[in-house]
């Protein structure tokens, strides 16, 4: 099994223990994600220490204030590291106001350019205020205009109304623990519609622990619970979904 999106540096417990617990649960590859200068460096360092860990580097939209050419150059430099396999997470977050929409747009556009130059996938964060779709709609428009052939991962997929649009574009949809919540049946139904070669699973740890662990701090080992729910709604065995997401991650991240 794989975890396509985690934040090891933010999880409770030691890094070695988290990686060992994941391996014991059958999780043998994970992508740990940077969000700012400090967590980018930590993600790369974790990837250097562990064979099973790979990194993504970028600037989260909530951290987009102050994004400039120097920040972009630093991300591009880290992006060339042999264990960095994606740029991000980046995108738009209109739920919080830690950075203005224009600051987020500048950072997003710059990171699409970096991903294009490096030939790396881009990890997309999207969050809207309840009942709105302006962020995800603008993300689609921006990627359509700028991303070209860059592989796109819609992390913590939360736009079931756009699952068909994502499939048409060949983008990857990665499902997190919130897809297991009783109130999120629309996400499970969306997971059933994603093409076999474009589905991924993730934890987004330490956030969004799947239902059996809800209320606890999430960790990569718990991705198996999300995978079980996704397998069930897709009408396949856990083992078949495991083979599918492992193959998809291998094709995407080259690990």
Model-flagged regions — what are they?
Residues 1-255:
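Mid-domain alpha/beta scaffold segments of enzyme catalytic cores
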């Amino acid at each position: 099994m794989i975890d396509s999106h985690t934040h090891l540096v933010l999880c409770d417990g030691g890094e070695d223990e988290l990686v060992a617990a994941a391996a014991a649960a059958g999780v043998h590859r994970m992508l740990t994600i940077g969000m700012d200068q400090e967590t980018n460096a930590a993600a790369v360092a974790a990837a250097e220490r562990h064979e099973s860990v790979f990194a993504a580097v970028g600037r989260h939209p909530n951290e987009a204030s102050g994004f400039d050419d120097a920040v972009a150059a630093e991300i591009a430099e880290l992006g060339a590291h042999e264990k960095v396999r994606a740029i991000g997470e980046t995108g738009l977050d209109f739920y919080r106001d830690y950075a203005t929409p224009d600051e987020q747009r500048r950072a997003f556009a710059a990171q699409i350019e970096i991903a294009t130059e490096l030939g790396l996938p881009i990890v997309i964060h999207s969050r809207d205020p309840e009942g709105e779709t302006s962020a995800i709609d603008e993300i689609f428009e921006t990627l359509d205009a700028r991303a070209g052939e860059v592989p796109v991962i819609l992390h913590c997929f939360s736009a079931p109304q756009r699952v068909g649009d994502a499939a048409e574009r060949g983008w990857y949809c990665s499902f997190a623990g919130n897809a297991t919540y009783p109130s999120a049946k629309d996400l499970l139904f969306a997971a059933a519609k994603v093409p076999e070669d474009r589905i991924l699973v993730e934890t987004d740890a330490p956030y969004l622990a799947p239902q059996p662990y809800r209320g606890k701090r999430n960790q990569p080992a718990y991705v198996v619970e999300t995978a079980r729910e996704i397998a069930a709604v897709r009408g396949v065995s856990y083992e078949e979904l495991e083979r599918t997401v492992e193959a998809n991650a291998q094709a995407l991240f080259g690990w």
